[in-house]
């Protein structure tokens, strides 16, 4: 027992004297390692009489516990001192710029849709939506599109079967909205549409915004005034607008709308016209009592003109170098 107390005292002194983790580990090996002093005491138990081994073993294990606790406490103290010394030695350069958190931005097409919705919303137009998989009635028949019209061929339209297709315009939303309500109507219908075309100015999927106003005594002059104000608002300057006679199955009379660019050339931006009486009849509205106008615009087309982009496909290639310009 006396010998164990001496070992504990010696170990405690060595532990307190250790000035580094390396020195402390050397003390651990000296007393607790395979050839350590306390390990040797355990190995010598076999030499004792059987009646003394149990008590002696308990005392040796108790001594090991005391030494282990002392080593653990000293290790914590040395680690804390080492950390404090490291922190004291290090300096923080407060002039170093922080890491910039990069903000995202809206896609230019989304920006354009929101701008259109805001303008027409201030004029009292609601925003309506409809399915992108459309049936022939809502996509063609109700819009006065003849059975032999080229748009009904698979050269222009993505068909699932003869009666179901990816919608080629958001005009079907106009039909559904009128089917489910009663005049007057005043709404726009933004959304994705699909046509079988792909080049510098066309993609198989693009965005359209169509609008409609149906009420008593609606006339073409009102349509012209609204679209002129819209285009000036959209381009944020007074623009020269031209209405050219055109043909659409669902409007009569019909017109295409151009704006004069800075180079003096006319650029087509949208189509419009007075709602054809057959369209009103297809949804149960009396064309003798009600009239209306409709218009439609390609969102990407307007976005290209507003931001000076000359290739429509850039909007869908997800090139961050391109998209970051619109933050």
UniProtKB/Swiss-Prot annotation:
User: What are the binding positions for Mg(2+) in this chain?
Assistant: 252
Per UniProt, the keywords (alphabetical) are:
Aminoacyl-tRNA synthetase, ATP-binding, Cytoplasm, Ligase, Magnesium, Metal-binding, Nucleotide-binding, Protein biosynthesis
Please name the top-level EC class of this enzyme.
ligase
Cofactor notes: Binds 2 magnesium ions per tetramer.
Q: Which cofactor does it need?
A: Mg(2+)
> Which Pfam family, any one, appears in the UniProt record?
tRNA-synt_2d
GO terms under cellular component: cytoplasm
Family listed: Belongs to the class-II aminoacyl-tRNA synthetase family. Phe-tRNA synthetase alpha subunit type 1 subfamily.
Q: What quaternary arrangement does the UniProt entry report?
A: Tetramer of two alpha and two beta subunits.
The protein, known as: Phenylalanine--tRNA ligase alpha subunit
Q: Which organism is it from?
A: Vibrio parahaemolyticus serotype O3:K6 (strain RIMD 2210633)
């Amino acid at each position: 027992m006396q010998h164990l107390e001496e070992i504990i005292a010696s170990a405690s002194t060595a532990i307190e004297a250790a000035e580094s983790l390396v020195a402390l580990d050397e003390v651990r090996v000296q007393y607790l390692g395979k050839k350590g002093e306390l390990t040797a005491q355990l190995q010598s138990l076999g030499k004792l009489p059987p009646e003394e081994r149990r008590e002696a073993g308990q005392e040796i294990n108790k001594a090991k516990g005391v030494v282990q606790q002392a080593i653990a406490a000293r290790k914590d103290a040395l680690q804390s001192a080492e950390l404090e010394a490291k922190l004291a030695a290090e300096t923080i350069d407060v002039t170093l710029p922080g890491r910039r958190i990069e903000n995202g931005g809206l896609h230019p097409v989304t920006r354009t849709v929101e701008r259109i919705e805001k303008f027409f919303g201030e004029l009292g137009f609601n925003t309506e939506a409809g399915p992108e998989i459309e049936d022939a009635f809502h996509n063609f028949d109700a819009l006065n599109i003849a059975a032999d019209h080229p748009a009904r061929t698979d050269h222009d339209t993505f068909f699932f079967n003869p009666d179901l297709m990816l919608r080629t315009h958001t005009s079907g939303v106009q039909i559904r909205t009128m089917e489910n309500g009663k005049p007057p109507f005043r709404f726009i219908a933004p959304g994705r549409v699909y046509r079988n075309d792909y080049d510098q100015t066309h993609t198989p999927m693009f965005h359209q915004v169509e609008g409609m106003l149906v009420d008593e005594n609606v006339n073409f002059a009102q349509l012209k005034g609204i679209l002129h104000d819209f285009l000036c608002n959209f381009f944020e300057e007074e623009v020269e607008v031209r209405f050219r006679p055109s043909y659409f199955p669902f409007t009569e009379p019909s017109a295409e709308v151009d704006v004069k660019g800075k180079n003096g050339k006319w650029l087509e931006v949208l189509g419009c016209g007075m709602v054809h009486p057959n369209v009103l009849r297809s949804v149960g509205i009396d064309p003798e009592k009600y009239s209306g106008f409709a218009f439609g615009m390609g969102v990407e087309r307007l976005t290209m003109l507003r931001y000076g982009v000359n290739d429509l496909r850039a909007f869908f290639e997800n090139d961050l170098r391109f998209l970051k310009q619109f933050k």
